[in-house]
Amino acid sequence: MDKFVRLEGLVAPLDRSNVDTDAIIPKQFLKSIKRSGFGPNAFDEWRYMDVGQPGQDNTGRPKNPNFVLNQPRYQGAEVLLTRANFGCGSSREHAPWALLDFGFKAIIAESFADIFFNNCFKNGILPIVLPAAEIEALFQQVEATPGYKLVVDLSAQAVVRPDGHGIPFQIDAFRKECLLNGWDDIGLTLRHAEKIREFEAKRRVDQPWLFS
């Protein structure tokens, strides 16, 4: 997992509440357990005018011109700005995989569904909860300013607007440490690799019948 320390990224505004995981990545694309390759089908039913299928070439599919992420000014966005209860619905780790593969590294919202919130941290995405008033102000600024970027400083726990105004956010200390160091569940386990090897070696001596 890549480290997350500081990001200066273009912001895309998804002005919707209760965006569920089926909207983020529809169910027909859940057959793969690889973490990559889901980006082209993120928000598939909103991005395209037809129904997508796994393995389909998306280059010729008609795009929905009214969907915000299809607008040229938001191409390459790394920060997603949205409303309350983002990531609700069924539990699927494919949802953060799709968002990360699409290019998003941070999501700013009024609130998140608990399981989705946890899955973001496990996959290197920083979910940030801000008060509704701050969210509303950001929406107004993003929509009024082409090329609007935010600095997301995890070390300082602040979202910094172009005018220099910093908006503090809270994050669990352990999750912060994991993102700063790029530790996912496997990375955390590998930190104890030497002790694991020592345990396995001792176990082979103490319980040799398990390995015969």
Curated annotation (Swiss-Prot):
Entry keywords, A to Z: Amino-acid biosynthesis, Branched-chain amino acid biosynthesis, Leucine biosynthesis, Lyase
Superkingdom assignment: Bacteria
GO biological process entries: L-leucine biosynthetic process
Catalytic activity, EC: 4.2.1.33
Any Pfam family hit: Aconitase_C
SUPFAM superfamilies to which the protein is assigned, alphabetical: LeuD/IlvD-like
InterPro entries from the UniProt entry: 3-IsopropMal_deHydase_ssu (IPR004431), Aconitase/3IPM_dehydase_swvl (IPR015928), AconitaseA/IPMdHydase_ssu_swvl (IPR000573), IPMI_Swivel (IPR033940), LeuD (IPR050075)
A single GO molecular function term of this UniProt record: 3-isopropylmalate dehydratase activity
Record Gene3D superfamilies: Aconitase, domain 4
Pathway(s) where this gene product acts: Amino-acid biosynthesis; L-leucine biosynthesis; L-leucine from 3-methyl-2-oxobutanoate: step 2/4
A GO cellular-component term linked to this record: 3-isopropylmalate dehydratase complex
CDD domains: IPMI_Swivel
Reaction(s) this enzyme catalyzes, per UniProt: (2R,3S)-3-isopropylmalate = (2S)-2-isopropylmalate
Family: Belongs to the LeuD family. LeuD type 1 subfamily.
Reported function: Catalyzes the isomerization between 2-isopropylmalate and 3-isopropylmalate, via the formation of 2-isopropylmaleate.
Annotated HAMAP family: LeuD_type1 (MF_01031)
Assembly behavior: Heterodimer of LeuC and LeuD.
Protein name per its UniProtKB record: 3-isopropylmalate dehydratase small subunit
